[in-house]
A protein has these predicted regions:
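Periplasmic/extracellular, small/polar-rich flexible segments of pilin-like filament-forming proteins
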Residues: 49-153
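Membrane-proximal N-terminal amphipathic helix
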Residues: 26-55, 65
Length: 153
């Protein structure tokens, strides 16, 4: 009888721990993928500093086609109106495979000396910055790093 109780408890603990472990793995994959966006940040910032407009696509930013900018968890890095869209694929968990995380440039339009700041996912820009580009993030906030979540004031 005691053995059945122990086995039942182990089963319950395993059922509770498995989703938590999977969530942690997904968050780690997202965090591991984020540095790939650094490839595009400087070229986009350079275009802004020279033209006061954001590059409409990869080519205008001086980057290869989206499918050529990849890593273990990202299958494409797409620039659209200055925003960097990371499409998850390759070895990414099936929960985020095909999903997108967007990093958008934020600028102070009337103070061009202020450098571009990057806003991750559903986060909001600091005042008085203006976010450029559209947010295509479709990954649930629970999986995103805290800095990428849509926190309210």
């Amino acid at each position: 009888m005691e053995m059945l109780v122990v086995i039942s408890l182990i089963g319950i603990l395993a059922a509770i721990a498995t989703p938590s472990l999977m969530d942690r793995i997904i968050r780690q994959q997202i965090e591991a993928a984020l540095p790939l966006a650094d490839i595009a940040k400087k070229p986009i910032s350079d275009v802004w500093s020279k033209t006061k407009s954001m590059p409409p696509d990869n080519q205008s930013a001086g980057l290869p086609v989206p499918e050529k900018i990849v890593n273990n968890f990202i299958s494409a890095l797409t620039v659209k109106d200055g925003a960097i869209h990371l499409t998850f694929g390759n070895r990414a968990n099936k929960q985020i495979n095909g999903k997108v995380l967007t990093l958008r440039p934020a600028v102070v339009t009337d103070a061009p000396i202020v450098p571009v700041t990057w806003v991750c996912g559903n986060a909001i820009a600091p005042n008085p910055m203006t976010i450029m580009g559209e947010n295509s993030t479709n990954i649930p906030d629970a999986y995103l790093p805290i800095a990428c979540r849509g926190l309210t004031k």
